[in-house]
Structures are given as C-alpha cells and as structure tokens.
Amino acid sequence: MEQTASPVVFAARDDASDVHFPHDDGSRVPYKVFSSRAVYDREQERIFRGPTWNFVALEAEIPNAGDFKSTFVGDTPVVVTRTEDGALSAWVNRCAHRGAQVCRKSRGNASSHTCVYHQWSFDNEGNLLGVPFRRGQKGMTGMPADFDPKQHGLRKLRVDSYRGLVFATFSDDVAPLPDYLGAQMRPWIDRIFHKPIEYLGCTRQYSKSNWKLYMENVKDPYHASMLHLFHTTFNIFRVGMKARSIPDANHGLHSIITVTKTGDDTSAAYKQQNIRSFDEGFHLEDESILDLVSEYDEDCTNHIQPIFPQLVIQQIHNTLVARQILPKGPDNFELIFHFFGYADDTPELRALRIKQANLVGPAGYISMEDTEATELVQRGTVRDADATSVIEMSRGNPEQQDTVITESLIRKFWVGYQKLMGY
C-alpha cells in the first residue's frame, strides 16, 4: 500500500545564524538550509535582494512599447515593462500608498498601471501619475501641500539584458551583468542565444520542496542517467558520452553541463550494473520526438546551464527553454518553463520544438522526475536539521571536467552560497 506523505513542518530550532557547514568545500550541507524559515528570510535579503542579477523575462515576451510581465525576484513581486522609448524597466509591484499589488495581470500591454484599492496610477517606469482627490474637493482637504508625486513612485530595480535575457537587481554593488555572468558562461549563453528568438509559451508547476534542492538538481549530472529512464534508454544522456561539467570561475554559482553522442556503444555499463534507468524493453510508438536537427557547431543532446539564482538555460535535442525558479517559502517553489525557438525557424522545426516540449515541464518524459526527487529529499530531511548530505562524487579529482560522474558543481555552488549568506 502506498504511503501517504505527511505535511512538511519546519525544523524546531530556527535561527538563521545557527547554521554550520562542517566542511568548507561544500561536501557536507546541513539539512536545516532546506527547511528553516529564518534561513529562507535571510536568503531573500542576502541573495535575491543582494549582489545578484535575477532573471525576470525574455525580451521576446515584451517586444512592444507598453508590454509588461508580472513576475518575482525571490518572493518579491515585480513587473517588467517595455517603456515608450523601447527601454526596459522593472519595479516592485507594491503601491506606494498602502502596499497593495498594483498590477494583477500576468502579462499584457498598457500605458499605465492603476492600483485597484485607491486608484493611484503609475506610468510604465513606476512614476506616480495621479492621486484621486489629491487637492481635495469643495473645500474638503486632500493631500498635504508638500506632497511631492516624484517622491512616491514605485520602487525601481536596475535592469539589464544579455542576448535577449532580461535580468533585474536591487543591488547597487553587483558587478555589471556581463561580468556577473562570467567569461566561462557567456560563450555557452551565446551558443543558444546567437540570433533573435520567438517566444512559444510556458508551463508552470509547483514543487513542495526548497528551491535550492532544484538548484542542486540542475548542477548534478550524476543523477541524470540514474533517475531518468527516458534519458538513458533513448540515448539522450548517458555516462560514456562526450561530456562537460564546468563551474564558473568567479564564484562557482553558475555552471554548464553538456553531453554529445560520439557513436560509441554507451549502453554496456548500464547493462553490466543492472541500472534501473536503462530498459531495452521500453519503446516509443512515435520516435519522431527523438529527432535531432543539426543547429550548432556541436550538436549536444543536452545543454543545462544554471545562472544563479533564478535561471536555467536548457537545450535538449531541439527543445529550447529558459527555466525560471521562484521561491515560495522554505518548502515550496514555482518552476516556469519558458519555451522558445528562433525567429527564422521553418514551420517544420517550430513544430518539432513544440513536440519536444513534451520532454520537459510538469508532465515531461524527463523532467517530471526531478521535482519528485526534490520532494523526497524535503520530506526525508525536515526533522533532521543538523544532519548533513554527503557530496563526495569526484571529490578526489575535483578539477576533472570531462565527466558526468561528478558532484563538483554542487560543491562549488555551496561554497559560493556560504559566502553570500555569511556562513
């Protein structure tokens, strides 16, 4: 009989400063960081409102003047807009009057935004346009004479874009966006975003687990051919393929994983070790979902590139995705898959990208297992705040990068995380 999962509850001792990483190389991670409300709140200030650039949109989502999109930086609601002069703007979706969310639509086009509560209105850059009855009426008093609309706009974020990816930050101290992305990561972003894109749509899902468990997951090539039967059985991602597992050199928080077929038989190791994720008896009725149209100098079957803290760039065969991670508390996050193609795609290639969208997303043949795994970790660790994970794979050769049998990217991530959080 299948067990019913108990509700997740937070660890009893909840002090954000009471977090101890026993090793400084990221190989031991206290489970408290996945369930503590205090740690989560500290992350909102030190990471999402700290010296990071947060992915908020694809420029292709807001191509025209007045286009807007509601999203989040961490758990702070923000709106990203295209201004009348074609520039990008982002502001906190919180009215300067009494704090209500101003914009209640997920996306659209508007020349201004009006708060439903008291009808204060703002332009696309967050500047206050109007206050009803500001000067009173028929002798009744209004706002004080010294009320200055210029001082009561919406809180603005700094915005920049790289190759059509839009990022926002609360910080005045963060490095310029190209430097933040880093010299090692930019060429891999350029690989995918080398020409204008077309936005195809998105899927959304929630996972009852901590957002960092997903960040671990996308930095973990070791799991990819163990957990995912589809990956391994249909030769999309296997041990033995040409591989890269590269962290960024600045802080270790970004990374790139790629695999490419070489023509060698990579199934033998799975057969010999009787690994569950390889199943020769598993067949597809329509194998066209596995078609691979050559588009790049190297036709990787898998390109997974986390850009900390909210973005994962993905290419699996010909499906292209910008995954957006939105924390919703210590034990919940929203995951949005933004699907895109290139503006000059043929109708046939566009149709293939849409078909291959079934590989990922909430019911994807591959990715549905990832959030199931992160929820299992969440449920398994919630009552053992002081216990730690063991992240040892390839620790004896941490600089090796031509392998997927490694947890080096996860260790680098945790080292960078500790520095940001002050642990």
UniProtKB/Swiss-Prot annotation:
Fe cation binds at H223, H228, D370. One of its GO terms (biological process) is catabolic process. GO terms for molecular function: 2 iron, 2 sulfur cluster binding; anthranilate 1,2-dioxygenase (deaminating, decarboxylating) activity; iron ion binding. Pfam families: Rieske, Ring_hydroxyl_A. Keywords: 2Fe-2S, Aromatic hydrocarbons catabolism, Dioxygenase, Iron, Iron-sulfur, Metal-binding, NAD, Oxidoreductase. Its cofactor is Fe cation; [2Fe-2S] cluster. Pathway: Aromatic compound metabolism; anthranilate degradation via hydroxylation; catechol from anthranilate: step 1/1. [2Fe-2S] cluster binds at C95, H97, C115, H118. Binds 1 Fe cation per subunit. Binds 1 [2Fe-2S] cluster per subunit. CDD domains: RHO_alpha_C_ahdA1c-like, Rieske_RO_Alpha_OHBDO_like. The keyword Oxidoreductase applies. The keyword Transcription does not apply. PANTHER family: 3-PHENYLPROPIONATE_CINNAMIC ACID DIOXYGENASE SUBUNIT ALPHA, CHOLINE MONOOXYGENASE, CHLOROPLASTIC. Belongs to the bacterial ring-hydroxylating dioxygenase alpha subunit family. Oxygenase component of anthranilate dioxygenase multicomponent enzyme system which catalyzes the incorporation of both atoms of molecular oxygen into anthranilate to form catechol. Can also act on benzoate and salicylate but not on 2-chlorobenzoate or o-toluate. Part of a multicomponent enzyme system composed of a reductase (AndAa), a ferredoxin (AndAb) and a two-subunit oxygenase component (AndAc and AndAd). This is Anthranilate 1,2-dioxygenase large subunit. It comes from Burkholderia cepacia (Pseudomonas cepacia).
